[in-house]
A protein has these predicted regions:
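N-terminal assembly/interaction segments in proteins that build large macromolecular machines
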Residues: 1-277
């Protein structure tokens, strides 16, 4: 029966390969010791499927699997080195891809594992996750700590949660400004200069205006320079400094991943019911 379902799943998956799957959910998992964690996006065609128990269980199991088994890439097609997530075996004994095929056969929609992020720390630090709106937005955050014992302090635990919420709400692209590549900076500056010139400003003035707008760009896109969502009088960097001072231990944001369900994917606009029937 299992072999038949696998074969049926392959056939169903092939039949639905051309459909658009831009709905779905983000799931996360962090190990009890907070030393490793994962963020996963699994897509389907309609929001209805995100409420199906089998789909939700698979998406959640997959996040734990990624954290524990440490795949390097989705598949060989990515061009990156393995191990590959879709080829790895789950607790059921089926591979991730076989499980996807089985879900496609039983649910009747195209289902895809789109992407994942995995963080792990061996040095003092902490992995924090945050899922917003039932899986529409997910965040994974890595923090470095000067003193390992500070990881159990309430002030630090609250900070980790608040920073993850900050990433979810404010959509930063970088931790700090030195992470912004030169090409991006050059493009942004060129746009700002062109805008100022189009507004009738002389070139010398346009250059200064562009520099000011570049500062605004940093404040919007760099996490440490953003205004803290819970206190407009603080930047995230100042918040870090305050909590670090209270704890007597340095804190550093190492990296983060922020996934928003279906971002960058084409949306369905056709008659889904008609297609299924």
């Amino acid at each position: 029966a299992v072999e038949f379902l696998r074969e049926k799943g392959l056939a169903a998956a092939a039949k639905k390969a051309g459909r658009i799957a831009a709905e779905g959910m983000i799931t996360s998992f962090v190990a009890p010791d907070k030393k490793c964690g994962a963020l996963v996006e699994v897509n389907c065609e309609t929001d209805f499927v995100t409420k199906v128990d089998d789909f939700r269980k698979f998406a959640q199991e997959l996040a734990e699997h990624v954290a524990v088994k440490a795949p390097k890439a989705l598949s060989a097609e990515t061009g990156k080195e393995g191990p590959y997530l879709l080829e790895q075996t789950l607790k059921s004994g089926a591979t991730v891809q076989e499980t996807v095929n089985q879900l496609v056969a039983s649910i009747g929609e195209k289902i895809t594992v789109r992407r994942f992020a995995r963080f792990e720390r061996s040095e003092p630090g902490f992995i924090q996750d945050y899922i917003h709106m039932g899986g529409k937005i997910g965040v994974l955050l890595e923090l470095a700590l000067e003193k390992a014992e500070a990881a159990g302090e309430e002030a630090f635990l609250n900070l980790a949660k608040d920073l993850a919420m900050q990433v979810a709400a404010a959509k930063p692209e970088y931790v700090r400004r030195d992470e912004v590549d030169e090409e991006t900076l050059a493009k942004e500056k060129a746009i700002y200069i062109a805008q100022a010139v189009n507004e009738g400003k002389p070139e010398a003035i346009a250059e200064k205006i562009a520099q000011g707008r570049l500062e605004k760009f940093f404040k919007e896109t760099c996490l440490e320079e953003q205004v803290y969502i819970k206190d407009n009088n603080l930047t995230v960097k100042k918040l870090l400094e305050q909590v670090a001072s209270d704890l007597g231990a340095g804190i550093k944001i190492v990296r983060f991943a922020r996934y928003e369900k279906g971002e960058g994917l084409a949306k369905r606009s056709d008659d889904f019911v008609g297609e299924v029937m």
